[in-house]
Amino acid sequence: MAVAFGISAWTRSVAGIGVAAAVALASLLPLSLSGHAAGTYEHANAVNSLGIHLVGVTVWAGGLVAVILCQKLAKGALPAVVGRYSTLAGWAFVAVAMSGIVNASLRIGTPLDLVTTAYGLLLLVKTAILVALGVAGFAHRRILIPGLVRDATRRTAFLRLAVGEVVVMSVAMGVSVALSRSAPPVPQTTIADVDPLASLIGFTFPDPVTPLRMLTAVHPDFLFLGVAAAMAGLYLVAVRRLRRRGDAWSAARTVPWLLGCAMLVYATSGGPAVYGAVHFSTHMIQHMMLMMYVPPLLVLGAPVLLLLRALPARKDGSRGVREWVLAATHSRYSRIVTNPIVAAVVFAGSLVAFYYTPWFEWSLATHQGHMLMTVHFLISGYLFFFVLIGVDPGPKRPPYLIRLMLLLATMAFHAFFGLAIMSGTQILAIDWWHQLGIQTDAQLLADQAAGGGIAWGAGELPVVLVALMVVRQWSGSEQRAATRYDRAAARDDDAEPPRLQRAALGPRRARRRAAEGAVMRRSAGDRAVPVAPDPQPDTDTARPTDRSTAS
């Protein structure tokens, strides 16, 4: 929080204020690691839901207080400010409600507990307050905001309802404090007292792994389940908006995006998530999915391009979602992380930095380490494949030949990493596997070798497919350049436009032709010495041969 205050005091730019707001919200997340969520059954979902709950409440209540305090500064723009806050509050309401449902499901054993325990009664009171606040927000959006647009003098009615909402929110926060200090119906004793193995992974220890169980086992991670559902839903809403407007959007982009969302759900809530902390080989399956399979599918969906086409640009100089996305894609930071060398080093170097440092064991033993691992590999994979096959707007990408060379080098490094894991004799994260105690050291080494083979083999398929996509994009780029050249030549009666000619010939041939032209011009300049005209021969004295030569 102190960092957020420091950033806001140091800069007055819109980007700086946005960074300060993001840092302030991130500072709330450590609070979710305390309270009922710490060390209990379903620890991961409890911590995630509490973190989302805190962020949603802060944005909702804090945003409303900010609108009330700054309403005089808005002047004639108050209707627009309130309308935009209403949209933000709607999303915060959904986040608070959904995270509250998840958290309550972990604390309530049966529906009867809602009316027979003090915890359940407080939960019902909080739910009633949430519904009342939702109704007030609906009134804001349907009645007061249109009234403010028609008549800006109706500010008093808005302030009256807004202050009333703040009072009700304060009551809800008081109930939340009482709820956090009440004993829930489901005992929140540390699960280490019940099942030591379950205490290590945070949920009931699974049965021995089989291929069928890898496909059918489910342990929902509600955070990534909600993220994937929101990504798929918002994408389809944007596509529908484009089509209703008469614009086309290819199914070749929609299908990969939806497949990527589905694969993200499977990697974080299916078999790879259930057995990811139990065996090295199953952990490697989850890792490869998060790093090598989900990101290229999401990149092919072109989400930034879709967003820019679906959302209108603001005309008043303020920043909405579209403006923030544009600012981010063209920022200095974006140019750095999408640099081909940087993206490749982060992508490939993360393998070594993760598995050959304490980070690997930290990701197995702690929830925050696992979350950092998941987010990091998703982002690093997305940036790497964005440089290779992305079509979204952003910093200038390298030529296609450089992309292929970069991909081949990364593929070679990936194969070397897999072979190193397969042939290694040191057990990685050995303390964690010994705590589980379900395999001997010989079995651990064999399983680790299998994981290295998975890293080598599973990583080759997406690399080959991406290489084919790069070649296809390269061929399409050449064909489009040739088509532009032919059209321009036809318009100019088959004359060759120099610029299009250079584009069709390619950069290397264009540079060679330019150099040859410069040499010819210099040579022509050296020969351009004034020479006196040859005297006309005298027809009377000239010999026949001279006469014929002169003619």
PLM regions: where:
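Alpha-helical membrane segments of multi-pass proteins
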Residues: 1-551
